[in-house]
């Protein structure tokens, strides 16, 4: 099942791209004048024919072939913990700087009388 994104294959994205382009072309051709305005019908019918061909003649079977047991290996194990340690140190350093520069900032009293 190569090429699966969000549980759907490349054909769904191909159809979505086709219809987005057809919609864009139809909007652009609506502004045209003369005989070019009527070419919207041919663009729409062409997209409809391409869609029916892609839907009626699928390349893969509907049910995927059973696969063997997959072993999941975490190849980025050490890098993930190094990144976690680095981000934790930056977070703690930021909290320390926030504490020293913002929270513990001294507030000086104003003199009551000026002599």
Curated annotation (Swiss-Prot):
Annotated localization: Membrane; Cell projection, Cilium
Described function: May be involved in ciliary biogenesis or function.
Family statement: Belongs to the TMEM218 family.
One CC-aspect GO term: membrane
Protein's name in the database: Transmembrane protein 218
Bilayer disposition of the protein: Multi-pass membrane protein
Transmembrane segments: 5-25, 38-58, 81-101
UniProtKB keywords: Cell projection, Membrane, Transmembrane, Transmembrane helix
InterPro entries: Tmem218
């Amino acid at each position: 099942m190569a090429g699966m994104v969000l549980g759907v294959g490349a054909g769904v994205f191909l159809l979505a791209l086709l219809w987005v382009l057809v919609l864009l072309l139809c909007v652009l051709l609506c502004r045209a004048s003369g005989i070019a305005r009527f070419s919207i019908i041919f663009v729409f019918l062409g997209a409809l024919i391409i869609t029916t061909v892609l839907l009626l003649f699928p390349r893969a079977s509907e049910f995927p072939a059973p696969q063997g047991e997959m072993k999941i290996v975490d190849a980025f194990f050490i890098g993930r913990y190094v990144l976690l340690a680095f981000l934790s140190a930056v977070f703690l350093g930021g909290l320390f700087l926030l504490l020293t520069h913002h929270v513990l900032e001294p507030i000086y009293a104003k003199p009551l009388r000026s002599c």
